[in-house]
From Swiss-Prot:
GO MF assignments: 8-oxo-7,8-dihydroguanine DNA N-glycosylase activity; class I DNA-(apurinic or apyrimidinic site) endonuclease activity; damaged DNA binding; zinc ion binding
Family listed: Belongs to the FPG family.
Gene3D superfamilies: 1.10.8.50, MutM-like, N-terminal (3.20.190.10)
Pfam family membership, one: zf-FPG_IleRS
Subunit organization: Monomer.
Zinc finger (FPG-type): 236-270
NCBIfam families in the cross-refs: fpg (TIGR00577), PRK01103.1 (NF002211)
Keyword DNA damage in record: yes
Cofactor: how and how many bound: Binds 1 zinc ion per subunit.
Biological process, per Gene Ontology: base-excision repair
Annotated source species: Chromobacterium violaceum (strain ATCC 12472 / DSM 30191 / JCM 1249 / CCUG 213 / NBRC 12614 / NCIMB 9131 / NCTC 9757 / MK)
Protein name: Formamidopyrimidine-DNA glycosylase
Xref: CDD domains: EcFpg-like_N
Function: Involved in base excision repair of DNA damaged by oxidation or by mutagenic agents. Acts as a DNA glycosylase that recognizes and removes damaged bases. Has a preference for oxidized purines, such as 7,8-dihydro-8-oxoguanine (8-oxoG). Has AP (apurinic/apyrimidinic) lyase activity and introduces nicks in the DNA strand. Cleaves the DNA backbone by beta-delta elimination to generate a single-strand break at the site of the removed base with both 3'- and 5'-phosphates.
């Protein structure tokens, strides 16, 4: 599933092709995504100038003169800038028309979304209750400590909660906890302020390194040019069960938390 680094990589890739351009309409081949594509999407976006391409959590926001397009990549989605005449493939569900180019939305599993919103986009129901951005100044050890101090859930599940901090999915939660030296099973409320300072710093560092590497490609993700990410080559724990820890040699363990796999080193993360 594309997480924050993959969505940010996509944003940076499509921004030069979209910002300042006028949308000519849309071609919707399959409206049955996680939420139905508006039936009049082409009419709504035709003539709209793209003022900015932003990201909020795992949502891409194409801010136009009259409204905002919200795009979520779901479990397997990607966006690519293609020549207008490029024939669509099986899972290419939607094109935004840019003249000689199109922005093509591909989503094999159809858990993504393309929605149109009028008014302040921060008030959209999908966005209005979100926590702070992990790479912003609003997220630090103090903010993390305040958000989790009454939570008895495991810390890994806490940092994956979008009310605590947005965009930290399973891959990057595992990696951040390893670098912070914190067991994923520790109760969130048991973390000290020093623990939270360390964890917040590592979340930022891991996400920045992942963005610099173009994100992670485990199955479907490619960037706007069709290229895979490379951060998976540097994983310390994720998907490395029974392999030796890169720091101490102890076999990496795998457990289940919240219906997801968790990976950790029992020696480095006591």
């Amino acid at each position: 599933m594309p997480e924050l680094p993959e969505v940010e990589t996509t944003r940076r890739g499509v921004e030069p092709h979209l910002e300042g351009r006028t949308l000519l309409g849309a071609v919707v081949r399959n409206p049955s995504l996680r939420w139905p594509v508006p039936p009049d999407l082409s009419e709504r976006v035709a003539g709209e100038k793209v003022l900015a391409v932003r990201r909020r959590a795992k949502y891409l926001l194409l801010e136009c003169e009259s409204g905002t397009l919200l795009i979520h990549l779901g479990m397997s989605g990607s966006l690519r800038v293609m020549p207008a005449g490029a024939p669509p493939q099986k899972h290419d569900h939607l094109d935004l028309l840019l003249g000689e180019q199109v922005l093509r939305f591909r989503d094999p599993r159809r858990f993504g979304a393309v929605l149109w919103h009028l008014g302040p986009v921060e008030m959209h129901p999908l966005l209005q209750a979100l926590g702070p951005e992990p790479l912003s100044d609003a997220f630090d050890g103090a903010a993390l400590h305040q958000a989790i101090r009454r939570r008895g859930s495991p810390i890994k599940l806490a940092i994956m909660d979008n009310h605590v901090v947005v965009g930290v999915g399973n891959i990057y939660a595992n990696e951040s906890l390893f670098h912070a030296g914190i067991s994923p099973a520790r109760a969130a409320c048991d973390l000290s302020r020093a623990d939270c300072d360390r964890l917040a710093a590592e979340i930022k560092a891991v996400l920045r390194r992942a963005i610099d590497a173009g994100g992670s490609t485990l199955r479907d993700f490619v960037d706007s040019e069709g290229k895979p990410g490379y951060f998976q080559q540097t994983y310390m724990v994720y998907n490395r069960q029974e392999e030796p820890c890169r720091l101490c040699g102890t076999p990496i363990r795998q457990i289940r938390q919240g219906q997801r796999s968790t990976y950790y080193c029992p020696l480095c993360q006591p």
